[in-house]
Amino acid sequence: MTIRPAYRPKIVKKRTKHFIRHQSDRYAKLSHKWRKPKGIDNRVRRRFKGQYLMPNIGYGSNKRTRHMLPTGFKKFLVHNVRELEVLLMQNREYCGEIAHGVSSNKRKEIVERAKQLSVRLTNPNARLRSQENE
């Protein structure tokens, strides 16, 4: 049986489109990642009509749904079994995510212990090798 979150509201994002960098469509050397314009005459910085929008605090998410996954849980990065036990009392609000650098042996231990503690993991099948019959 899967663990369900204690509270699962509808997550509303005020803006789903990415903020893109000014003139990144014009020059290939400029990446699309957002950079704040600093120029004295810059149209985007001065917020002229028809220009790219700048990110600001008004686009922030609801405080209760910030950092929430679509499942209704918040993510907690787990590197070993001991860190997993922190989630014992919070297993209806937080779910564990096994860190990238954890070996497959330790991953098995973490997955087993999570099942015992009834803690949900976001990536329980990641890098778990099954033995092939030869």
Swiss-Prot record:
The name this protein goes by in its record: Large ribosomal subunit protein eL32
Keywords: Ribonucleoprotein, Ribosomal protein
Gene Ontology biological-process entries: translation
Name of one Pfam family that matches: Ribosomal_L32e
Organism: Drosophila acanthoptera (Fruit fly)
Stretches that traverse the bilayer: none
Domain of life: Eukaryota
Family affiliation: Belongs to the eukaryotic ribosomal protein eL32 family.
GO terms assigned for molecular function: structural constituent of ribosome
Gene Ontology cellular-component annotations: cytosolic large ribosomal subunit
